[in-house]
């Protein structure tokens, strides 16, 4: 018997003598351990409560974080002359990267639609716009189309261009004007229109496609060389003026890039051209597109502006 039981028996006997029947009817005390919860059960219950509280807190934290972090919108990009060649490669590269792309073209509507379709197959968004970038009304309409569709413009790649090659002494003024209007004035008009939009949100990137010919000249391309050299000088000024509004302007100068035109060159001509390139081969449109993507989207390029990048395999070292 326990000490508690002995005391209870003694108490009952004493109470009986004194006539306190109620006390005699008191039930036997239960052992102390049966009156207390098992520590193992207590631990389990406590653990369950703690886990539930932690889970609830984690869920609340996740919800708060989701609400606090703003949704990142896909950059809106306008690429001129994007239906083929370098422009096509740039549009596809930016589309793959998640951009919303306006694919500009002048005459190649079918090809532009194919580019747009490919971007959508990658999971991106794209629209096409037929317009002449040397005409102010077309440029304004193009920019408005992008803004109406997606709300803003983040990046512009001025790639549209033509050639009208002939020796200087034989060049007609119309050939000069046509190349200057599209290759230089077109860059001016698109950059001006885009800058007005970008200034409002104090952010934007403009990449102008020039040429190695604008750096070193080339026989039979006085008009083209003048236009591309003009693009380089123009871009440096635009970079200085846009810097206070966080608008970066840079230039890419391709050399000999594989195209439908190079594919039609004879073996002898190709051998001569490749002999002038230290790397001994043509560049690919995707090489240019990769550089443009870096300048357009990478945080690492945010401190680069007013710079001219050559991508020519060493041709103009």
Swiss-Prot record:
Keyword Chloroplast in annotation: yes
Listed InterPro entries: 3oxo_ACP_reduc, NAD(P)-bd_dom_sf, Sc_DH/Rdtase_CS, SDR, SDR_fam
Catalysed reaction equations from the record: a (3R)-hydroxyacyl-[ACP] + NADP(+) = a 3-oxoacyl-[ACP] + NADPH + H(+)
Pfam family, one: adh_short
Pathway: Lipid metabolism; fatty acid biosynthesis
GO MF annotation, one: NAD binding
Residues noted as binding substrate in the record, renumbered to the chain: 211
Gene Ontology terms: biological process: fatty acid biosynthetic process
GO CC annotations, alphabetized: chloroplast
Record-linked SUPFAM superfamilies: NAD(P)-binding Rossmann-fold domains
Active site residues per record: 224
Stretch forming the transit peptide: 1-57
Keyword Nucleus included in the entry's annotation: no
EC number of this enzyme: 1.1.1.100
Binding site residues for NADP(+): 79-103
UniProt main location, coarse: plastid
Places the protein is found: Plastid, Chloroplast; Plastid
Keywords: Chloroplast, Fatty acid biosynthesis, Fatty acid metabolism, Lipid biosynthesis, Lipid metabolism, NADP, Oxidoreductase, Plastid, Transit peptide
Oligomer status and interactors: Homotetramer.
PANTHER family per the UniProt record, alphabetical: 3-OXOACYL-(ACYL-CARRIER-PROTEIN) REDUCTASE, 3-OXOACYL-[ACYL-CARRIER-PROTEIN] REDUCTASE FABG
NCBIfam families from the UniProt entry: 3oxo_ACP_reduc, PRK12826.1-2
Stated family: Belongs to the short-chain dehydrogenases/reductases (SDR) family.
Protein name: 3-oxoacyl-[acyl-carrier-protein] reductase 5, chloroplastic
Organism: Brassica napus
